[in-house]
Amino acid sequence: MNKKEEVLEGFAEVFNKRAWLDKVKMEKALAGYAASEVHCIEFIGKHKDPNVTKMAESMYMTRGAISKLTKKMLKKQYIESYQKADNKKEIYFKLTAEGKKVFEIHEQLHKEFENRDQAVFEPIKDEQYDAFLN
């Protein structure tokens, strides 16, 4: 196995272990919500004027899939749609009180997981992060 394959395999292993560690707590705290709904809520909660196109590009889904997902979420009252006065064509989304609740739970879980994993990342120096990112 060459170095590139070793690095990719290492990343995959870390990703899979984190997913496994996070899964039980995430499923318990967000029971009743589909993973796609939670990711959509996360995107809407973190971005200004999110629309179908922005969400599709970020979530690597088709616009059709996002449209279907947002319609379902509108019906469940996790999100609301709105339009700007200067652009009646484009539809944007914002979180309802229920959506904000899910967003906050999800963010808190990520902070807990980050704290849990802190010991793994402490020995890594900035130069090493830079090497991975460049």
What are these regions (language model features)?
Residues 71-129:
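Charged, amphipathic alpha-helical coiled-coil/dimerization segments
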Residues 21-64:
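N-terminal helix-turn-helix DNA-binding core of bacterial DNA-binding proteins
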Residues 1-32:
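N-terminal leader segment of winged-helix/HTH proteins
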Residues 42, 104, 133:
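A cross-family signal for key residues in well-ordered alpha-helices
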Residues 1, 45, 60, 122-125:
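Alpha-solenoid HEAT/Armadillo repeat architecture
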